[in-house]
């Protein structure tokens, strides 16, 4: 019996849309997003039928001579039909999409309400399968927790990470906060909550991301890399595949045909920021510039930037083989930039205020460079053709170098303002560097999973010989294809010293990153499920044990949690340090503690972790609420010792679980199908950044970052503690 061939996650579009075509489908989608689960065509049909019914007794001559005879029945029909749709959508918004009862129940024993909710969900998916953003306006508003609950939960999370004397003082200032300025700030937060769909996201994006004056490289960038197995494509072919597949993804997102996760239950608001757009630096605050789907992408090779069109002059998308020839011709040119001009992209690694000043001076005030900057900032995405062939997974050193290079680049081959910078090394292995401010890691991971599904499982790869033959560029190809256009920047006074300064600064920051990539193949989540514990809870408890062994203490720990079931939401902080987790770690370090006690405490700690996850998913987080209160206090001129204390605490341990977004890749069929995951820089100078994911049922992938300049941390040492923790925790279930 033949295996079922994987399906494309989005349409294979043949042409780049013209202005009229794009206007047409965007207009349709505008109605779709305001009428679902009723489609625009049936909606118009109902209006037409209702209008015709009201006019059945009128003669055609009367209708032709008196327009108001038609307008009144038409207005009644539109009002009546839309009123029904309006009521239906409000029922769905406030009852169906707002229902979170299933999170509180045993999945094996659902309540009647959950059974009814599940049945309604199946009916909706059957009669009106949603497009990418069909349900976005139906998602409930992010709830505002009570002030007392938030402060109480915060104090619970700080009990084990704060010295006793400081904790007593924290309780005192929290009580004063609750009885004075906290109440006033909560009232302003309540007003924000009532008059906006999400009282957090606008503040979060502005003050956590766009107002930050730090360099985007390492501090805001996140990395994604691909499969464990060897790549069967040459570098040129892999670059062409990226250009082709990601152009299709870009156009599908714009058409709202991109297959979303969650079947309409999750916010897709930030997918529109993945392609075409660019973060624009400002002297005090950046902004994100969205652009319509572009016809070109950027390719950088040996420090030289090229505009590569992904369609011909008539808008017909180039095939992979045609793009292969365009990329091959580009790579074999003798027009490469030299000297400091080959490092011009390092300007984007600078602090944001300085980059804003240099952008104005070197680009906007120069007519030629301003034109080229527009080409860059409106491009779909960037693809870096890297010269290194050292990317691999054969050793820890190679895997760690692979992950680090994907995160940082070399200072000349990433335009960090762009949301997506893909990279392909000389041996054909690839990865991507994402800019975090316009979207979250889960959305970028979704994009990368879809790419891998198409690249490795759907498209057929030619033999090595066929690839090399197709890379040959004939005279006929030069006449019929639109070849890459080099971006020839003009030298401006002062540019050389600034480029060299930025490049050296980035090189120093890159060398300070201590990356250790763990590819743990001893077991995966399959083994953990047989133990009856949460896989994420298992890894988080292992992290807590490893950190305690590494530092001799518990610390405030960040884990990103999802609240995307609420409108325009991004992430919330899940705090893994609990009474149960600390009791478990202490038992593990106690030689006198029996194995059955340790096992019991591990299960309780994982259960507490799962319950915290559910609280986050229901909108009952702590940190985003307190963050908004901090912003309001500063804006309104309130002095708050409690909020000052909260905002001054460092995240010495920052973690993130990169979820499997699509389940489109069978990671259990072969070790070569394991997706290696991602990484990010440690948030604190003396802290660790830990990004992990499960490679199906057979692996745990983890990237640990710290800084060589810190005397407190060591990624290699922490990695050893992590592997020991994995084995010691699973050994509790040996019998």
Model region roles, listed by residue range:
Residues 1-418, 427-428, 435, 439-735:
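Long, Pro/Ser/Thr-rich low-complexity/intrinsically disordered regulatory tracts in eukaryotic proteins
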């Amino acid at each position: 019996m033949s295996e079922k061939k994987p399906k494309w996650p989005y349409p294979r579009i043949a042409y780049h849309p013209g202005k009229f075509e794009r206007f047409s489908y965007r207009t349709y989608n505008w109605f779709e997003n305001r009428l679902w689960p009723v489609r625009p065509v049936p909606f118009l049909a109902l209006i037409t039928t209702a209008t015709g019914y009201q006019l059945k007794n009128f003669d055609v001559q009367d209708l032709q001579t008196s327009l108001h005879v038609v307008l009144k029945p038409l207005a009644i029909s539109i009002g009546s039909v839309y009123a029904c749709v309006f009521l239906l959508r409000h029922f769905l918004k406030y009852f169906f999409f707002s229902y979170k009862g299933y999170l509180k129940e045993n999945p094996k024993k659902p309540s009647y309400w959950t059974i009814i909710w599940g049945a309604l969900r199946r009916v909706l998916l059957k009669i009106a399968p949603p497009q990418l953003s069909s349900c976005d306006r139906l998602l409930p508003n992010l709830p505002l927790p009570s002030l007392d609950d938030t402060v109480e939960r915060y104090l619970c999370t700080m009990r084990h990470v704060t010295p006793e004397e400081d904790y007593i003082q924290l309780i005192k200032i929290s009580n004063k906060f609750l009885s004075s300025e906290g109440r006033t700030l909560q009232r302003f937060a309540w007003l924000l909550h009532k008059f906006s769909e999400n009282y957090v996201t606008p503040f979060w994006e502005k003050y956590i991301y766009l107002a930050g004056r730090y360099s985007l490289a390492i501090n805001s960038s996140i990395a994604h890399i691909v499969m464990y197995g060897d790549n069967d494509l040459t570098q040129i072919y892999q670059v062409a595949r990226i250009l082709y597949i990601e152009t299709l993804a870009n156009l599908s997102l714009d058409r709202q045909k991109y297959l979303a996760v969650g079947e309409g239950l999750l916010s897709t608001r930030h997918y529109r920021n993945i392609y075409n757009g660019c973060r624009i630096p400002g002297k005090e605050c950046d902004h994100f510039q969205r652009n319509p789907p572009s016809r070109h992408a950027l390719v950088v090779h040996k420090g030289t930037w090229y505009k590569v069109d992904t369609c011909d002059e008539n808008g017909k998308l180039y095939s992979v083989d045609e793009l292969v020839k365009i990329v091959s011709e580009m790579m074999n040119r003798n027009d490469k930039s030299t000297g400091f001009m080959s490092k011009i992209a390092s300007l984007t690694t600078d602090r944001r205020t300085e980059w804003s000043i240099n952008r104005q001076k070197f680009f906007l005030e120069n007519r030629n460079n301003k034109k080229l900057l527009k080409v860059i900032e409106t491009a779909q995405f960037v693809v870096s053709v890297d010269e290194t062939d050292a990317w691999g997974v054969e050793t820890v050193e190679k895997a760690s170098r692979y992950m680090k290079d994907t995160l940082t680049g070399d200072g000349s081959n990433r335009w960090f303002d762009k949301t997506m910078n893909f990279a392909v090394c000389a041996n054909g292995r690839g990865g991507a560097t994402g800019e975090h401010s316009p979207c979250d890691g889960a959305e970028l991971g979704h994009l990368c999973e879809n790419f891998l599904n198409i690249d490795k499982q759907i498209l057929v790869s030619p033999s090595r010989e066929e690839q090399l033959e197709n890379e040959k560029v004939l005279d006929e190809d030069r006449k019929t294809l639109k070849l890459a256009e080099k971006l020839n920047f003009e030298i401006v006074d002062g540019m050389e010293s600034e480029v060299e300064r930025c490049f050296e600064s980035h090189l120093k920051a890159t060398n300070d990153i201590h990356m250790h990539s763990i590819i743990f193949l001893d077991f995966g989540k399959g083994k953990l499920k047989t133990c009856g514990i949460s896989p994420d809870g298992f890894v988080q408890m292992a992290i807590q044990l490893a950190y305690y062994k590494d530092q001799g203490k518990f610390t405030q720990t960040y884990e990103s949690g999802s609240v995307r079931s609420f409108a325009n939401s991004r992430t919330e902080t899940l705090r893994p340090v609990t009474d149960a987790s600390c009791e478990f770690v202490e038992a593990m370090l106690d030689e006198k503690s029996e194995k059955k006690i340790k096992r019991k405490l591990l299960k309780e700690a994982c259960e507490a972790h799962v319950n915290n996850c559910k609280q986050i998913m229901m909108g009952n987080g702590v940190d985003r609420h307190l963050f908004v209160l901090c912003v309001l206090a500063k804006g309104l001129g309130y002095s708050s010792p409690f909020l000052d204390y909260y905002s001054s605490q460092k995240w010495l341990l920052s973690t993130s679980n990169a979820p499997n977004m699509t389940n489109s890749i069978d990671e259990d069929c072969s070790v070569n199908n394991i997706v290696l995951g991602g990484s990010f820089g440690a948030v604190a100078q003396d802290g660790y950044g830990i990004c992990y994911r499960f490679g199906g049922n057979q692996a745990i992938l983890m990237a640990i970052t710290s800084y060589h300049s810190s005397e407190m941390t060591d990624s290699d040492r922490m990695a050893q503690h992590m592997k020991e923790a994995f084995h010691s925790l699973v050994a509790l279930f040996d019998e």
